[in-house]
Amino acid sequence: MNLAVIFPQSGGLPLGKRPPQRRAYHMMELKRWKAHLSVDLNYEPKHFPTNDMPAALIAIAAQQAGHNIADLSLAIMRKCWVEEMDVAEDATLIEAANQCGLDGTALSAASKQDDAKQAYDANTQEASDKQVFGAPTYI
């Protein structure tokens, strides 16, 4: 879903535009989750925020190809939050898909097709219709 559409509908703001106390709380939550889950996590990744649409589109393309996207989603998140890579770049997304045993090049090409973008737009509309206000959200 397109968070740039969803956030303003509920009065939400991107992290960089939030007041200092909300940014501080965000940082505290990251630290709590890192400790709770015992995972690697950069609190301020080099490439965040970034354009998340390419990552969403490659996940949609994988799903449309019949793949379970749980591992791919995790690999993409690791690229950003652990490995300091930009998930707006094709090379990063292709590498993430390949690491999951998928054909990253084929999925990258599929992610640029109209049906992937239409699904992205439909996901955004569904999120809006169901009053989603942020991410992650599970419907």
Named regions from a protein language model:
Residues 1, 64-67, 71, 75-139:
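C-terminal cap of thioredoxin/glutaredoxin-like
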Residues 1-80:
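Structural alpha/beta surface segment adjacent to cysteine/selenocysteine redox centers
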